[in-house]
Structure formats: structure tokens, C-alpha cells
Amino acid sequence: MNRAMKAAVDDLDGVTVHDLYRCYPDFYIDVAREQRLCEEHDVIIFQHPFYWYSTPSIMKEWLDLVLQHGWAYGSEGRALEGKYYFHALTAGGDDSTYRHQGANLFTISELLSPYRATANLCRMRWLPPFAVLGIHQGLADELIRSHASDYRLMVTAFRDEMIDLESVIDTPYLNSNLADIIRQS
């Protein structure tokens, strides 16, 4: 599913797809390069599988190295101020497992709290995730194509500034109802 989502946006003009594992197979992250990329974009999306209620390890390494005091946060750190930040994730469990009475005890939103706190510290605008759940049950090819198409539609809407940001604040997932959050031109 993650490959299909990435492929759905790879060819979009005005959108940068940046694969950390491809760029840094040795985990030696070029901090200056990554900071430049962040400065050049208004929307930052972490697209990943939701491993053990978190991001893959390279994303944690990226956060630890790239979001430096004085650049991303602190009294002088304003490089990310006002930028939009969210996760596009896939998870094995379905929506019923990500509830207080479910197998995972917490909602996806609650499990993403450390990233929301990071966004807040960096003065970024946090948005709910684009979430594809139930991956462990297997997804039919048609459903994979549908989710990938929705992801492309949403990323395109962000690029074209067609997202109604007021309407997304209270939604659990950006893709809960794309028709309600994408303004018609």
C-alpha cells in the first residue's frame, strides 16, 4: 500500500517526494540538505507504515538530527513556523482496534501525540493523518488503487491550495471524507 501511495504522487508537478531510505541507506542524514528541503516547502508529509505505534526508525533519526534548536524551535528557531505537517500512514489494525476499548487501547490521533507536540514546538500547523487501516487483513487491488487515488487527490489539493483547513481540524483522518475538505474551484 505504501508503494502504491508513493507511486500515486511521484509524478506530480510541484510536489517533492523524498525517500529517506533511498537517500540515506547508511542513516547518515545530510542535515543541511534536509533543512533546505523543509524551508522550500509549505506542507511536510511523513508517509510511512505505522510500525509499533510509531514511524520507521529513520524518521525518528531525521527528527532528532534535522529539527535543531535555533533552527526549528527555541526563541530563534522559526524555520518551520506556519508550515503544515501531517502523517500519511498505513496500519495493520482496522479502525475498531484503534479505540479505547479496542486491541490497541488508543486512537491513531493519541498515538501520534508526540509528533503533534513536535509540530507545536516547531510552530507548525498540525493536521490529522491520512490513514489507511486494516492492512494486515489484506486489501484488494481495487481498494489499493482507490486509496492511492485518494492520496493523490489530497496531495494535489494541498499543492493547489484547495483544502478547506477549517473543516479538517475535527476529522479523525484527512481521508475520512475528501469531498468535504476539498474546495471546488
Feature names for model-found ranges:
Residues A119-S185:
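Glycine-rich phosphate/pyrophosphate-binding loop and the adjoining helix
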Residues V15-E39:
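N-terminal beta-loop-helix "entrance" segment that forms/cooperates
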Residues M1-D11, T107-C122:
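Short, solvent-exposed amphipathic alpha-helices that sit
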Residues R33-R116:
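Helix-loop-strand module that forms the ligand-binding subsite of alpha/beta enzymes
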Residues T16-H18, I45, F86-A88, L127-F130:
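Hydrophobic/aromatic beta-strand patches that form the interior of the parallel beta-sheet core
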Residues M1-A4, I29, S57-E61, E142:
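Generic recognition of short, well-ordered alpha-helical segments
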Residues M1-H18, R152, T156:
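N-terminal beta1-alpha1 ligand-phosphate binding loop
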